[in-house]
């Protein structure tokens, strides 16, 4: 008789081969047809809300691995919260104004842009941005991200621009917005301010000089600075040191020079000066406030300030500060330390009277004269030249300069705004916790916020200038009037309409009372655009109440979106816009290097998706400790395919052995489950509990490790291996088989749900193969989280099994040794003799005597007092070949082989099954 046909072998249509790349597209189409986003929300109608608010990526190119990481993380959170019973809307957004887009458009347009009006350039920018909104939308959807893709928020849309202006109006009304001098890019040949998008970088040969500044207190004590712009020295007012860097005081002749310790060798090598005689080491902060003699004008002084932007890449770690000619110089020198803005250069790039003897000289021509003067004064340490990348004007291709001009600012201290923000920071939950201190220190130290940009592509600042008296006016009434226009026509109206149409009919200059104005053309910093998203989303969407539950972005956003959002929200609404902030690290290559095209180490997420499937990318992310920087390469991604295969095979085995299991008719009550099955069900509860804790703390890599270990070591290598005999050999409807199936069914459903937020495609596929009674919804994404059942955990049983599984490890070692010696082939060829180490273990083995053969997958287990061959911690183990004959059906050895005519060559158990006598 062919006994194989009497076994209950697994049957399933769930394929072994995933074919992810094609299968994922099928599910995407199905989700589209069912209107997945709205369907899932409908299933949570009336449930409590959880709102993760999307930080908008720039619509200036295809998505990269960083944006993919960010969106998948958000998707995991939203899907988990949905399964926990929350109504979790997710509205994606796009940041569509600003430099990155204007820069790309100017590159595409080339020379043509010079003939175009601001309105025409803006139209091109809008087309470019919306094109990439559509591209990125499809790419994000391909990753399996669920969201309201048809109704995103887009910062260039009129209804959003109105909200930007509304938030800005509040700041103006509160008196937080003011106008002041600030250095910006200036082209002396074109005589115009330039936006960053109008800057091109080319190689440029500049002087490279080291200059020593003499202390006012000690004529032999000097700080050595390095600069490539000698022409800015007449505007010098300070010297910046890093507060925490170590600086060496070096004896050179009779003089003492201060140079950053880490740069001493490079300095000596370049200048040929011996710096080996270090007499003292100090921190930058030790010199704060000290006065030094100005290198050009002996009657002026230069004060030491501290700045954390000072680097140890080149120079001396001591930076000459001219707030009139540099952005950092301005922020640290003028805003933080109150140093004066000296900018003795006119619009043609010539020195003014303020520069003394250099008056009338073109700045580049003055470089050589200044170097000679420094040499004559004995303070030029070394001079050479350097070729470096330097900003040039895109119009005339000449080098540009930084020159102080008027700009708009938000005062962060007016109305106690900074203090209010700090108080709100402490009310927010920061994950990881160090995020709180990071953003706190940034807020504590930040200067006033420069919000004006000399760019075309942005939200215009609705300021006007009186033609009669020159007063620049920023008035809430003008902003409000403009907002009404924007609602209908968008912000392009500012660049297209005459000024008379843009201001209220009765509006006059508050200074002179006249009504003759011209438009100012500055635009707002794009961080105000994105920072105002809370106002748009909470006023336009009923399912987004203020404050929002979570913001989730990269850790650079402590300085960016988290920062701008909390300032604007505190100003507008009086509190932080978020309750919880979760941050992730950055993606590096396998060697921990930053990704760059020049290194050739960039991983394109869509390339991964097309080669392996989005599921593998999602699995890679889940495997990563994303709170820190994450490493990726195609090799690292490929490693996940093997993990994926193991997980998939686990589900295939479960589905295959549950094909005939009706969850309503065939379920075995908990109290009737067999011992091993009760243990496995208890273990599942522990897995559910831990997985839930890890998801709640957003530690997805711990979920991944837990599940992978569970699938490979506890299921495949233990429980599922152990119950194969019962599943295949016992009668189809017997308690022995149905007991195992009951627990396997629980494992299947729970494991599917635990993995659904991460493996969104594969768990949908698993769901589609479930018994129809297990499918309550159209999608697994609408299912509820598995319930943790404490009553299913028998603590004594779990403790006993810890010892039994330890003994099992020793048995497996002993079996392997005998396999190597060809004593046995399969483990069922074996009889295992156990020698307990003590009476407690003996009692344990006696208690579970009936399940030991099944647990060890052997034909016989006996206990003995004699010495065993393998010495374990709890037992000694001897393995020998089992006596008797091999059952032709279950392969166990027995001394009672059947001689029945109908069923010859089988063991008593199989004979009973075949006769229908074993239930």
From Swiss-Prot:
Keywords: Aminoacyl-tRNA synthetase, ATP-binding, Cytoplasm, Ligase, Metal-binding, Nucleotide-binding, Protein biosynthesis, Zinc
Substrates-to-products reaction catalysed: tRNA(Ile) + L-isoleucine + ATP = L-isoleucyl-tRNA(Ile) + AMP + diphosphate
Residue numbers binding ATP: 597
Alphabetical list of HAMAP family matching this protein: Ile_tRNA_synth_type1
Location within or outside the cell: Cytoplasm
Listed Gene3D superfamilies: 1.10.730.20, HUPs (3.40.50.620), Ile-tRNA synthetase CP2 domain-like (1.10.10.830)
Subunit structure: Monomer.
Protein name per UniProt: Isoleucine--tRNA ligase
Binding site for L-isoleucyl-5'-AMP: 553
Domain notes: IleRS has two distinct active sites: one for aminoacylation and one for editing. The misactivated valine is translocated from the active site to the editing site, which sterically excludes the correctly activated isoleucine. The single editing site contains two valyl binding pockets, one specific for each substrate (Val-AMP or Val-tRNA(Ile)).
Residue ranges the record marks as coiled coil: none
EC number: 6.1.1.5
Motif ('HIGH' region): 57-67
SUPFAM superfamilies: Anticodon-binding domain of a subclass of class I aminoacyl-tRNA synthetases, Nucleotidylyl transferase, ValRS/IleRS/LeuRS editing domain
Swiss-Prot/TrEMBL cofactor(s): Zn(2+)
Record gene name: ileS
Entry annotated with the keyword Metal-binding: yes
UniProt keyword annotation of S-adenosyl-L-methionine present: no
Cofactor note: Binds 1 zinc ion per subunit.
'KMSKS' region, short sequence motif: residues: 594-598
Molecular function per GO: aminoacyl-tRNA deacylase activity; ATP binding; isoleucine-tRNA ligase activity; tRNA binding; zinc ion binding
Biological process, per Gene Ontology: isoleucyl-tRNA aminoacylation
Domain of life: Bacteria
Cellular-component GO terms for this entry: cytosol
């Amino acid at each position: 008789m062919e006994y194989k046909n009497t076994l209950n072998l697994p049957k399933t249509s769930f394929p072994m081969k995933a074919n992810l790349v094609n299968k994922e597209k099928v599910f995407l189409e199905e989700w589209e047809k069912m209107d997945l986003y709205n369907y899932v929300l409908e299933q949570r109608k009336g449930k409590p809300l959880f709102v993760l608010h999307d930080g908008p990526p720039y619509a200036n190119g295809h998505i990269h691995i960083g944006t993919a990481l960010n969106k998948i993380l958000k998707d995991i959170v939203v899907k988990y919260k949905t399964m926990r019973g929350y109504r979790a809307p997710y509205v994606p957004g796009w940041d569509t104004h600003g430099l990155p887009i204007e820069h790309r458009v100017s590159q595409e347009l080339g020379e043509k842009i010079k003939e175009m009006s601001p309105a025409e350039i803006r139209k091109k920018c809008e087309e470019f941005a919306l094109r990439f909104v559509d591209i990125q939308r499809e790419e994000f959807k391909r990753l399996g991200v669920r969201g309201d893709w048809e109704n995103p928020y887009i910062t260039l849309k009129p209804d959003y621009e109105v909200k930007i202006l509304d938030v800005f109006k509040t700041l103006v009304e509160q008196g937080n917005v003011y106008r002041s001098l600030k250095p910006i890019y200036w082209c002396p040949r074109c005589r115009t301010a330039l936006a960053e998008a109008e800057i091109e970088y080319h190689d440029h040969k500049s002087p490279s000089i080291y200059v020593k500044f003499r202390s006012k207190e000690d004529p032999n004590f000097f700080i050595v600075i390095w600069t490539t712009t000698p022409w800015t020295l007449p505007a010098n007012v300070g010297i910046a040191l890093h507060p925490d860097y170590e600086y060496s005081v070096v004896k050179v002749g009779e003089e003492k020079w201060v140079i950053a310790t880490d740069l001493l060798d490079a300095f000596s090598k370049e200048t040929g000066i011996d710096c080996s005689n270090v007499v003292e080491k100090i921190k930058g902060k030790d010199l704060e406030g000290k006065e030094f003699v100005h290198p050009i004008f002996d009657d002026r002084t230069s004060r030491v300030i501290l700045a954390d932007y000072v680097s140890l890449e080149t120079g001396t770690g001591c930076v000459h500060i001219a707030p009139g000619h540099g952005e950092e110089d301005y922020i640290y020198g003028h805003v933080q330390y109150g140093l004066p803005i000296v900018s003795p250069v006119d619009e043609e790039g010539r020195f003014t009277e303020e520069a003394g003897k250099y008056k009338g000289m073109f700045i580049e021509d003055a470089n050589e004269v200044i170097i000679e003067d420094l040499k004559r004064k004995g303070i030029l340490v070394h001079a050479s030249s350097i070729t470096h990348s330097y900003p040039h004007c895109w119009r005339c291709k000449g080098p540009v300069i930084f020159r102080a001009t008027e700009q708009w600012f938000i005062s962060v201290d007016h109305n106690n705004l900074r203090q209010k923000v700090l108080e709100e920071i402490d009310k927010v939950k920061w994950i990881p916790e160090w995020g709180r201190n990071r953003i706190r220190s940034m807020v504590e130290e930040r200067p006033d916020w420069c919000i004006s940009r000399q760019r075309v592509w942005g939200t215009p600042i609705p300021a006007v200038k009186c033609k009669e008296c020159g007063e620049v006016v920023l008035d809430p009434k003008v902003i409000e009037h403009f907002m009404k226009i924007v609602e209908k026509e968008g912000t392009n109206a500012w660049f297209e309409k005459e000024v008379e149409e843009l201001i209220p009919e009765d509006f006059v200059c508050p200074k002179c009372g006249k009504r003759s104005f011209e438009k100012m053309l500055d635009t707002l910093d794009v961080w105000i655009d994105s920072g105002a998203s809370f106002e748009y989303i909470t006023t336009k969407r009923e399912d987004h109440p203020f404050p929002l539950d979570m913001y989730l972005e990269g850790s650079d956003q402590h300085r960016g979106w988290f920062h701008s959002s909390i300032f604007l929200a505190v100003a507008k609404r009086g509190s932080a816009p978020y309750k919880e902030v979760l941050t992730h690290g950055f993606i590096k290559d396998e060697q921990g290097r930053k990704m760059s095209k020049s290194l050739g180490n960039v991983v394109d997420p869509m390339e991964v998706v097309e080669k392996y499937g989005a599921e593998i990318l999602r699995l890679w992310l889940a495997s990563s400790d994303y709170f820190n920087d994450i490493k990726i390469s195609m090799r690292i991604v490929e490693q996940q395919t093997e993990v994926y295969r193991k997980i998939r095979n686990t589900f295939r085995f479960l589905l295959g052995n549950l094909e005939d299991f009706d969850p309503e008719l065939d379920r075995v009550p908990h109290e009737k489950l067999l011992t091993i099955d009760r243990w496995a069900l208890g273990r599942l509860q522990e897995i559910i509990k831990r997985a839930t804790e890890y998801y709640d703390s957003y530690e997805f890599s711990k979920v991944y490790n837990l599940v992978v270990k569970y699938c490979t070591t506890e299921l495949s290598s233990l429980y599922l291996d152990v119950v194969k005999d019962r599943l295949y050999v016992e009668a189809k409807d017997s308690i022995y088989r149905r007991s195992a199936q009951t627990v396997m069914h629980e494992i299947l459903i729970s494991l599917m749900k635990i993995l659904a937020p991460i493996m969104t495609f594969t768990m949908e596929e698993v769901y589609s193969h479930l018994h129809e009674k297990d499918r309550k919804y159209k999608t697994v994404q609408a299912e509820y989280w598995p319930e943790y059942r404490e009553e299913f955990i028998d603590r004594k049983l779990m403790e006993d099994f810890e010892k039994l599984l330890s003994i099992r490890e020793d048995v497996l070692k002993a079996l392997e040794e005998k396999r190597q010696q060809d004593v046995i082939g399969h483990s069922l060829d074996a009889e295992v003799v156990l020698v307990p180490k003590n009476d407690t273990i003996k009692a344990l083995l006696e208690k579970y005597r009936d399940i030991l053969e099944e647990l060890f997958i052997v034909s016989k287990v006996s206990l003995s007092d004699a010495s065993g061959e393998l010495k374990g911690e709890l037992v000694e183990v001897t393995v020998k070949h089992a006596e008797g004959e091999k059952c032709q059906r279950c392969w166990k050895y027995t001394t009672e082989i059947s001689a029945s005519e109908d069923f010859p060559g089988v063991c008593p158990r199989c004979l009973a099954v075949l006769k229908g006598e074993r239930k």
